Amino acid sequence: MNSLLMITACLVLFGTVWAKEGYLVNKSTGCKYGCFWLGKNENCDMECKAKNQGGSYGYCYSFACWCEGLPDSTPTYPLPNKSCSKK
């Protein structure tokens, strides 16, 4: 029983340690989600935790939303074969 608990704890730890992080990206433009209030930022945190993103925490870093705890399925900046096209 103790072995099962240890294995479960290790799997949870690996999931937390190996979780994806990066800048949130707009899939249609290829640009990062921008922000102005550096550090703790409610908008970035809300965007990162949104159902379609699945992150655990977000904050403003270098004037863009940085997310932690993202699932592998969530795209982050830069997108392959797509550069940021500001028009």
UniProtKB/Swiss-Prot annotation:
Signal sequence range: 1-19
Secreted found in the keyword field: yes
Propeptide: 86-87
Keywords, sorted A to Z: Disulfide bond, Ion channel impairing toxin, Neurotoxin, Secreted, Signal, Toxin, Voltage-gated sodium channel impairing toxin
The LCN-type CS-alpha/beta domain, residue ranges: 20-85
TM stretches of this protein: none
InterPro entries: LCN-type_CS_alpha_beta_dom (IPR044062), Scorpion_toxin-like (IPR003614), Scorpion_toxin-like_sf (IPR036574), Scorpion_toxinL (IPR018218), Scorpion_toxinL/defensin (IPR002061)
GO CC annotation: extracellular region
CDD domains in the record: neurotoxins_LC_scorpion
Pfam families: Toxin_3 (PF00537)
Similarity-based family: Belongs to the long (4 C-C) scorpion toxin superfamily. Sodium channel inhibitor family. Beta subfamily.
Its job: Beta toxins bind voltage-independently at site-4 of sodium channels (Nav) and shift the voltage of activation toward more negative potentials thereby affecting sodium channel activation and promoting spontaneous and repetitive firing.
Name the UniProt record assigns to this protein: Toxin Cll5c
Species assigned in the record: Centruroides limpidus (Mexican scorpion)
